[in-house]
Amino acid sequence: MTDIVLEPGAAPLSVWREIWRGAGVRLDPAAHAVVAQSAEAVTRILARGEPVYGINTGFGKLATVRIEDADLATLQRNLVLSHAAGVGEASPRAVVRLMMALKLASLAQGASGVRPVTVQLLERMIAQDLIPVVPGQGSVGASGDLAPLAHMAAAMLGVGEIETAGQRLPAGEALAAAGLAPLALGPKEGLALLNGTQFSTANALAGLFEAERLFRSALVTGALSTEAAKGSDTPFDARIHALRRQPGQVEAARALRELMAGSAIRASHLKDDERVQDPYCLRCQPQVMGAALDVLRQAAATLGFEANGVSDNPLIFAGDTNNGEDEALSGGNFHAEPVAFAADMIALAVCEIGSIAERRIAMLVDPALSGLPAFLTPKPGLNSGFMIPQVTAAALVSENKQLAHPASVDSIPTSANQEDHVSMAAHGARRLLAMTANLEGVVAIELLAAAQGCDFHAPLTSSEALERVRARLRRDVPSLDHDRHFAPDIAAAQAIVRAGELAFPDLPGVA
């Protein structure tokens, strides 16, 4: 995989998607000069002897405590070590790696006051696959993601653990083995590494990219379920959706039409079909999936801005680019409310994609609704067929309904009420990978059920696109002619979905 050259402040969503998938990262060399200017500005600001938050003062409620020049380096080290107070299971290394790339892009914009050596160490750690072990719990999404980013920063100091080559090693040992020296922090640098929304944003982007893959996959399984139930494609007619003018709905309807185009199964019941209208789970796919697509795109836009932004505090404006005056401005860019809202939107979309998919599975196993054998087995009674896979799908969907509760409506005061309103973005973003894992199971079960339903229509075949999907599944999972151990079938279908084999690139996506 080719390395991505990261242009701070100008990276499209596709860049973050490729980094999430494991692409290498190199910083645009032009960024180093901008970083150096920012660090020099911090030196000049300190020389003025003025109190500047986080540079020569305490933090949070202790911001009024002035720190002597001789203690400035100790101040930053103490900040990192004291804030590395996360708990819980380690975050997925792909998420931590993405977080590191986001932090690299933020620091490289020259508004954080760090030295080039600090940026270079972070860049080299990504390049050499030195990924800090970061506990998942401990951030409330303001002031930034302090605890998770502190664990990243601590690893740069040689404290904590680093995962590399499948091993967890003491951070100092891992750095030494890679030929890297632990960082000795300069003024402002500890705060610059800790302050920011990169943990929440990385988790939210990971959830978004997984949701995009599963959205596309669910369009395919939804079309296949429509075929299995001998549903109509009339509700997907372009004229219906043009009148409503909802962009996602228009695109979802077009995708369903194209997926079903040329189906012999559909042609077999164009006339003399007693059903005037299909159940909502078939008929309203464009409306539900289109709304989900629109919400995912809105979240993607928000996260795209956040990924390219600077969420540090205070921000350094170097005199070279600021009318000759060096300034350190305190603000609130660390507040992750935009990320929290985006994560909540993604959660709602993921929940609804699974909800309507489970309803299609339930319809397929019910002979009164689908016209297919009960529970999709040739000999119901002797065999239970898809009875319990549908229950599993229902369980996964119900779990996602609980997980979809908005995180952004919660807040709790911290730091002796100095930080009295927080976003809970980390909570909202962290749950997304659990939700998409649940959705993956639902989509996999629908793939199995829909393919099984189509088997009963032989020798009639579906469209060329959907027959390719069935053929791919049948390479790993034979048709269910009698009961067998079902878990391996679901696992095999999940592997197909996870590999993105249903997420055709010409289907609608977030960007």
From Swiss-Prot:
Q: Name one GO biological process term.
A: L-histidine catabolic process to glutamate and formate
Which PROSITE patterns does its entry note?
PAL_HISTIDASE
Q: Which reaction does it catalyse?
A: L-histidine = trans-urocanate + NH4(+)
Pathway(s): Amino-acid degradation; L-histidine degradation into L-glutamate; N-formimidoyl-L-glutamate from L-histidine: step 1/3
Tell me which UniProt keywords the record has, alphabetically: Cytoplasm, Histidine metabolism, Lyase
Question: What is the recorded post-translational modification?
Answer: Contains an active site 4-methylidene-imidazol-5-one (MIO), which is formed autocatalytically by cyclization and dehydration of residues Ala-Ser-Gly.
This enzyme's EC code(s): 4.3.1.3
2,3-didehydroalanine (Ser), modified sites:
S143
UniProt lists the family membership as follows: Belongs to the PAL/histidase family.
Annotated protein name in UniProt: Histidine ammonia-lyase
Name the source organism.
Answer: Phenylobacterium zucineum (strain HLK1)
Q: What is the name of the gene encoding this protein?
A: hutH
